Every structure is written in C-alpha cells, then in structure tokens.
C-alpha cells in the first residue's frame, strides 16, 4: 500500500499561456526557474476555447494542413531547447482541430532549430 503521508516528491507546473494570443514570452522566466529544479516539471500552454476551436476547424476545412494554433512557433521556439535539455515536459492544447498537424509542425521546429541537447 502506498503511504501518501511520507511522499516527498514534488511536481512543478508552470503556465506559459492562458488564452490564444497570450504573451509569447511568459514561459521564459518559468523555464529559467525550472532549470535548477531536479523534480518533475511541466510547462503548460492553455490556448483553446470554444470559439478558438471553431475558428481552427474553419481553417482546417479550408486547408487540411491548418487548424492548429497559428501561434505555436511563437510559444515553443523560445523555450524548446531549454525544455529538452532540462527535461521539462510541455503540455498544450495548441493542436486544436488538427493535433497531428501541430505535432508535425513541432517536429519541423525541433529539426530546424539548432539545439544543444536532444532527448
């Protein structure tokens, strides 16, 4: 049986965005703080609401390569290298109506951006 009273491990969660088009640099100081922490770390970008999803679906209907957050690059590029190096997991709903498209775009960002460390 697991004893929750003696559990000492902490989990750190930071929020880099709270709505579509939120500040693109908000995650940078969070990641800087996370770099020195040796516990599980998660960086969240919450950018989706009902209206945002409806707009994303319209984009995807018109072009099946679209439908994910048009801001994905702006949020991810400034912190991707440090997140990879310091094992900070990124959680987001930037995939909107096209999560596979967002994953492909993220892969392209990762391949095209020079990084010091890849996991």
What are these regions (language model features)?
Residues 19-21, 49-51, 94-103:
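Gly/Ser/Thr-rich loops at beta-strand to alpha-helix junctions
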Residues 109-119:
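Single conserved hydrophobic/aromatic residue that forms the stacking wall/gate
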Residues 25-27, 53-58, 101-106:
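Short acidic, glycine/serine/threonine-rich loops at helix termini
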Residues 5-12, 50-66, 83-86:
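Gly-rich Lys/Arg/Thr-decorated short loops/hinges at beta-loop-alpha junctions or inter-strand turns
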Residues 10-14, 40-44, 88-91:
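Structural motif
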């Amino acid at each position: 049986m697991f004893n929750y009273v003696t559990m000492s491990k902490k989990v750190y969660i930071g929020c880099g965005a709270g709505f579509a088009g939120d500040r693109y640099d908000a995650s940078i100081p969070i990641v800087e703080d996370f770099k020195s922490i040796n516990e599980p770390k998660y960086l969240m970008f919450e950018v989706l609401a009902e209206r945002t999803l409806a707009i994303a679906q319209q984009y995807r209907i018109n072009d099946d390569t679209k439908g994910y957050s048009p801001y994905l690059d702006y949020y991810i590029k400034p912190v991707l290298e440090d997140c990879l190096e310091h094992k900070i997991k990124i959680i987001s709903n930037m995939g909107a109506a096209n999560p596979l498209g967002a994953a492909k775009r993220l892969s392209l960002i990762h391949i095209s951006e020079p990084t010091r460390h890849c996991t």
